[in-house]
């Protein structure tokens, strides 16, 4: 593909509550065996983008560990590859990334030293499948300065947490509002952009000269009437992880056959770092209904409408319903967990009950951390 890829993976959200204490949002576990960033990385690999940079910042240890080998996404190559950039103290800079535009500016050498004519920018906190080649073809066809991947979402979604766009009959974005107080459109930005590399360098340098730091507010919103900004409409599944509720809903979506088949049975594949673990084990007395049970897990009790991540242990006479159990969790006998997210490496003592509601998902974080199964 005639583009380099940039994944913005340094952000945090207070709405994630305690779940982001251990990891960046881009490293949040998804669908039993994946991380949020795997979807953007897989899309870039499947689109034949050979030169990809990941910008990390907040709580990046877990994310850096996940990205320690690029071979899982087929970026282990002599030319190009996967690069991870963190904020660096230099003679001219001693700040963290102050915004998305500032992150691009602090890594401007990556853009200047590349030779591909286009750049694909994506977030590491979104779950979707997309061939970026189709977006680039649309971008060239429309002679656009910037192309924004957009999607119509349902009335049940909280529109105010997204950037909302207004599109004319030709597909051009005529108005862009970043997280307005009230919904004025049913079409949102998916946080995926295609732009010519030289133009991006010019815009980023202009932002830096004027001490502007945000890509959306200081480029998309500011230049919406001065640049040809077009919308590419995404028709397939897309989800953004930005809160406990959205994280829970995204994982629960993978219990739906149509979502699961779209990601894991339809070409192309989604890739992730692989752990050499035995298959899940179901002991006598185990009952499992409509659940994803990941490798290395052991189930002795009842699990319904839930997701167990790697190396989870469910004791005798336990009942787990409508819950997400993260990696390396030990759940003692006679425990009831409903409508909860249990943090990784927690030890849940026997004869314990944790019950949330569909409207208020309970995040369970115990002080008794386990480090081996």
Where do the model's predicted regions map?
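Unchanged
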Residues: 1-254, 364-366
